[in-house]
């Protein structure tokens, strides 16, 4: 995924939420995405852990 991609994010206790990627940071363990959400327009960071399906919080919108 890259900046400006439309995505959904997994959050605790609710359905996936739509957002837009504002920034991407790569790490050995996975990727951090700064995602703008309706109630966090300036963005909130989510981490996708490499190699662990349960650690995937950001997915590209179809």
Swiss-Prot record:
InterPro entries: Dextransucrase_DSRB. It comes from the Bacteria. Belongs to the DsrB family. NCBIfam families: PRK10708.1. HAMAP family: DsrB. This is Protein DsrB. It comes from Escherichia fergusonii (strain ATCC 35469 / DSM 13698 / CCUG 18766 / IAM 14443 / JCM 21226 / LMG 7866 / NBRC 102419 / NCTC 12128 / CDC 0568-73). The gene is dsrB.
């Amino acid at each position: 995924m890259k900046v400006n991609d439309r995505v959904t994010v997994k959050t605790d206790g609710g359905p996936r939420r739509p957002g837009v990627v504002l920034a991407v940071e790569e790490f050995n363990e996975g990727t951090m995405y700064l995602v703008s959400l309706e109630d966090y327009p300036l963005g909130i960071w989510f981490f996708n852990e490499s190699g662990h399906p349960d650690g995937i919080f950001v997915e590209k919108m179809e």
